[in-house]
């Protein structure tokens, strides 16, 4: 498996709002995070949702975001993070 991004690499979630079924939460789009794990390749869930074959398979990443970067006015600890599983087609180099 050849992954486009490596553990420790900074990425930005695409800020796109296509119609239909998407697996990327709105709240994380446009934000910068760091790859924590390359999970593996899986069938594309956005295609599977419509009864298609899910090909080509996409690489899934576990990406960590600082809470204070995601939520305006966040007053928790600056060490607080959110970890979101995101497919490669939603990520860009930071």
Feature map (PLM): residue ranges:
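Basic/aromatic-rich interaction segments and small domains that mediate binding to polyanionic partners
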Residues: 1-94
């Amino acid at each position: 498996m050849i992954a486009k991004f490596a553990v420790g690499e900074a990425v930005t979630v695409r800020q796109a709002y296509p119609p239909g079924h998407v697996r990327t939460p709105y709240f994380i789009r446009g934000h910068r995070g760091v790859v924590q794990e390359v999970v593996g390749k899986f069938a594309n869930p956005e295609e599977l949702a419509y009864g298609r074959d899910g090909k080509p398979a996409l690489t899934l990443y576990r990406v960590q975001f600082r809470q204070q970067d995601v939520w305006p006015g966040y007053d928790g600890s600056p060490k607080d993070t959110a970890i979101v599983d995101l497919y490669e087609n939603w990520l860009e180099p930071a």
